[in-house]
Regions:
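Short, well-structured N-terminal submotif of metal-dependent ribonuclease cores
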Residues: 1-33, 45-56, 124-131
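Alpha-helix capping/helix-boundary segments
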Residues: 5-6, 37, 73, 93, ...
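Acidic catalytic patch
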Residues: 12, 36, 62-83
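A short acidic, helix-capping loop that chelates divalent metal ions and anchors anionic groups
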Residues: 8, 40-43, 77
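Short, high-confidence coil segments that cap the C-terminus of an alpha-helix
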Residues: 28-29, 86, 100-102
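Short beta-strand scaffold positions
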Residues: 1, 32-33, 68, 88-91, ...
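Acidic, PIN/NYN-like endoribonuclease modules and their adjacent C-terminal/linker elements
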Residues: 40, 66-67, 94-131
Length: 131
């Protein structure tokens, strides 16, 4: 998962709220989380003392399978980024998912983004998932 999915689930105002929450609450789904994901969502919530938001994200991290960065993940991210024209954080998220053996990567990004060109893993957009 990426930060956009978590933010959509937390915000409750996004058009993607129900879809994002359904993904996070699916008991048959293993969520893959990482330091990259933490860095995208936690610092601002902590800095601004948004306790409920922090608790929400922490619950997701506690439920997820935590994958730490490694030189192999960084090398994979570099390869993905240059092969598919990915932004740095998108490449890291996808490399983490691949390292974890995930069957798919779900993002809150719109379907036209470069991450959806990646062939190494099925990347899906919340925008195309029916709740």
């Amino acid at each position: 998962i990426d930060a956009n999915l978590l933010i959509a689930a937390w915000s409750a105002q996004s058009a993607l709220f129900e879809r994002a929450l359904a993904i996070l609450e699916d008991p048959d789904r293993t969520l893959i989380v990482s330091d990259a994901l933490w860095l995208e969502v936690m610092p601002k919530a902590i800095y601004h003392a948004h306790a409920e938001e922090c608790a929400f994200y922490q619950a997701v991290f506690a439920r997820g399978e935590y994958i730490t960065w490694s030189s192999e993940i960084v090398a994979s991210a570099k390869h993905l980024a240059q092969s598919h024209g990915l932004a740095a954080m998108d490449a890291i998220h996808l490399a983490v998912a691949l390292a974890a053996g995930a069957s798919e990567f779900i993002s809150g990004e719109k379907p036209g983004k470069p991450m959806f060109r990646v062939k190494e893993i099925s990347a899906r957009s919340l925008w195309g998932i029916v709740p």
